Amino acid sequence: MSEMTPREIVHELDSHIIGQDKAKRSVAIALRNRWRRMQLAPELRTEVTPKNILMIGPTGVGKTEIARRLAKLANAPFIKVEATKFTEVGYVGKEVESIIRDLTDVAIKMTHQQAVEKVKFRAEEHAEDRILDILLPPARDAWGNNEEGDNDSGTRQSFRKKLREGKLDDKEIEVDVAAPQVGVEIMAPPGMEEMTNQLQGMFQNLSGGNTTKKRKMKIVDALKALTEEEGAKLVNPEELKEQAIFNVENHGIVFIDEIDKICKGSNSHSGDVSREGVQRDLLPLVEGSTVSTKHGMVKTDHMLFITSGAFQMAKPSDLIPELQGRLPIRVELEALTANDFKRILTEPNASLTEQYIALLATENVKVEFTEDGISRIAESAFQVNETTENIGARRLHTVMERLMEEISYDASEKNGESLIVDAEYVSSRLGELVADEDLSRFIL
């Protein structure tokens, strides 16, 4: 798991997300508290439960982006789900317990990758030996047994050196690799994923276990395939499963987006009975319960839950009281201003303007955005958000695509030319659309 301090986490988030300091601080503290808890004595550790977070803010202000970036920083099992994908037990659709099953699968895969990475050097050596045995078969006696001899002779060492330098990469060899397991596609009703997984596992076991298959491939591809195969042999599956379940129980993070969509608004009179039921099904997970997965029983007592929603049609108080009580940290994200849009266009790593400059540079077209041009783009996006539907920073993608449409289309014929995107150019491309509310409603 990540050992970054809250200040380091916020600094990292700042390089991708503009503003929203309160939300960044909250998730940074929550992430650091995961590390702090693991430093405690075991008796006290079991008593410390995570403080779950509810992020409230209009669409397009950075809620989902914070989750995406946090997943990369956490170095822990992390899953992001949409609350609207789930239904109450008994209705057609996915049950909320599948969140924990999917998170456990993520943890198994992550732990396996880390374990294989630790033995990578040994696995590469074993893979090299197998390839060298194909290139330089050992001498055999009259009965077909390998003769004892100087197997690591000068010739073998010479070939090993060439192999490591990549001089043999394009040579083709026939190699025995593990045959892919035969997948059995089973169509099951929604909510029956666990039963489907068990049936698939049973059929795979019946199909003959570990079999090998001769394949002709380049040495560079063979080395990669054999390294993976040898790495898998060097890790203990039982230890790996045990470690993965420990990781998911103590470090797992669940991000639930669009939680406002499963609220029953105060003025709602629809017959959609399964909405509040989803909240009731979520409650045991957030409170702490034990979920059965194909890898074993997983406890959710110490998982961190981060939820978010726009809450335009409902209020946080429309959540059932028990769930509200389990989301003690409330963070309100602010709507973006024209100045925020200007910063979004230039400050983050791989900003939108950088992306367009790099894309068109592949066609040898030089694009330059001036200060006043960027200001005009930001003002245009902000104005359209104000007069039509406010979709936050996502409006910048629409505006930029419209602005760069002509040069993107003609770029292949304008090899070596330059384009300066200033306020005048932006006005000529977007002015009429921004001014006409009906046009901007449909086009921007």
Curated annotation (Swiss-Prot):
Domain of life: Bacteria
Single GO cellular component term: HslUV protease complex
Keywords: ATP-binding, Chaperone, Cytoplasm, Nucleotide-binding, Stress response
Binding-site list for ATP: 18, 60-65, 257, 322, 394
Record localization: Cytoplasm
Region (Disordered): 141-161
UniProt xrefs under SMART domains: AAA (SM00382), ClpB_D2-small (SM01086)
Keyword Chaperone tagged: yes
One Pfam family from the record: AAA
An MF annotation (GO) of this entry: proteasome-activating activity
Signal peptide bounds: none
Gene3D superfamilies on file: 1.10.8.60, DNA helicase RuvA subunit, C-terminal domain, P-loop containing nucleotide triphosphate hydrolases
Function: ATPase subunit of a proteasome-like degradation complex; this subunit has chaperone activity. The binding of ATP and its subsequent hydrolysis by HslU are essential for unfolding of protein substrates subsequently hydrolyzed by HslV. HslU recognizes the N-terminal part of its protein substrates and unfolds these before they are guided to HslV for hydrolysis.
Subunit structure of this chain's protein: A double ring-shaped homohexamer of HslV is capped on each side by a ring-shaped HslU homohexamer. The assembly of the HslU/HslV complex is dependent on binding of ATP.
PANTHER family registered for this protein in UniProt: ATP-DEPENDENT CLP PROTEASE ATP-BINDING SUBUNIT CLPX-LIKE, MITOCHONDRIAL-RELATED, ATP-DEPENDENT PROTEASE ATPASE SUBUNIT HSLU
Family: Belongs to the ClpX chaperone family. HslU subfamily.
UniProt name for this protein: ATP-dependent protease ATPase subunit HslU
Species name: Aliivibrio fischeri (strain MJ11) (Vibrio fischeri)
Gene: hslU
